[in-house]
């Protein structure tokens, strides 16, 4: 359904069958958007994306997940052969699926790692990051931290002292916690790390800690510049608060029916179907394949 009450959204509806810019890039959030709650791409959504790719649309998988947690889905969609990109760590890294080349990579200031770990300890919540093998965390039995393993299909690796363990560049850290505490802890983190790192929610139980200025919209802007395209050529679908920036930025921003309200408010279109019922397929058929 169209999100009414915004002149830009009304204009898009009027232009839909006429002079709307050709969509050449499709950015898709994964969890709660492209995948269902079992973290799978449904057959219908896969078929619709295949049709879009065959029409020359470049698919970008844009997620807070680490690159290793996105690559299996990229290969499932054939992006390693047909072309496409991975935007991982909420935009901290952009990878060309065919070549493996990193087009963009931004890492956290190493000095912030022990402070972030201390902040999490003071809040009595789990904090994690990644290495080449999986998810790295002191609280390896934590219910909320293990949701990242379920999401990414990566193993949990226990370390005794995360701050000392991380002696390599990282693109982000992730705070995992009871949803009832998310907003309070996030507000405290924003205050403590203001001007040095960005903290924002990406799910009911995750708070991202990323380099200052890293967000999906900024990284997509860099990718579009690399491709010689404009945001009018870009469509994006998402559901979480970390998707709001890209939904507001792109030419056609789509929120899933299951999206958080601020994301719906930023979108030009809200799907009638949620992520468990092919919401992405609905949006792609409507705006790219133009099926009513």
Short names for language-model regions:
Residues 24-37:
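Asp-based phosphoryl-transfer active-site loop
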